[in-house]
Amino acid sequence: YKRQALGIPWRMRSVRERFEREVVDYFTDSYFRGRTPAPCTRCNSRIKWPCLAAEADALGIRYIATGHYFRITSAGGKRYVTRAADNRKDQSYYLWDLPQEVLDRVLTPMGTVIKRNIVEELADRRESMGVCFLEGRPCRDFLRSRDKTEALRPGPIIDSAGHRLGTHDGAALYTIGQKKGLDLPPGWAVVAIDTAANRIVAGEEKLLLHRTLEVGECRLVESDEVFGARDIRAVIRGIGRNPEGYAAVFPAASGIRIELEDPAWAPAAGQPVVLYRGERVVGGGILERYYYCLL
């Protein structure tokens, strides 16, 4: 936006090294471990919001705001990330990991507006989409540029019985549920990835239906509100289809265990699982394991 039209002073701080370490390296390492990361979520909790808060502190400014589409609501003395009025552009899923000390000072100017009204004001600016640091490159080209150990090499595609089906270009280049770029039988997809052995397991799509999820790196706004509740919904983005119905959440050694009323299709380790109660984000975490696992 033309900041001059609003009379807003401009200050810039470089956080390149921190971004490289916290987001880009995390993204790369996750894929090389056979996981499917969500870099935007990590950037929000590790870079954008804490750096913005720190800069505001240095200037003696109490409140902070961005152009994200979400709202803040309060309940029981807690602040909650809440879905935006524009459901098509809602970004609450990517903000589940923001701590209370940040939410306490957040203003959400975009939370109650419809994006098409804003687009009319910004008609000369392209909408940002995708992973910013890829700069338009395919993800696999980026990963090849970061392959320092020559891990990306051809390997076997097998079925659950160990029968060879074909050859892949490097296990880290694929994700759970993927079909594109693989010569698989009709109705089959990637069901497991073993980067240590450089192999991919393929199988029927029904093998990707999971009801039980184990989630780590959790943040719950109020655990008593989540455990035992019967109106929690779990949202999982990525290549898979999001589960319908409600979810039951239980404490577990690794974080939380989620039992889905209806199965999720193709959830991938490394993806955020975000818990909603109505419009409010009540918690979330990173998917570690699911009930059916071939490896």
Language model segments and positions:
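Short, glycine- and charge-enriched coil/turn segments that flank and shape catalytic ligand pockets
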Residues: L59-G60, T73-Y80, R146-R153, A161-H163, ...
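Basic, glycine-rich polyanion-binding accessory segments appended to enzymes
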Residues: D194-L295
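Core alpha/beta nucleotide-donor-binding catalytic domains of modification enzymes
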Residues: K2-A123, L134-R153, A189
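Short, solvent-exposed secondary-structure boundary motifs
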Residues: A84-D86, I176-G187, R233-R241, A264
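Short polybasic amphipathic segments
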Residues: V81, P154-I157, A234, V273
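Anionic-ligand-binding alpha/beta catalytic cores of soluble enzymes and soluble regulatory domains
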Residues: G111, R116-V221
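Short acidic, glycine-rich loop/turn motifs
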Residues: A85, I157-A161, I236-I239, R277
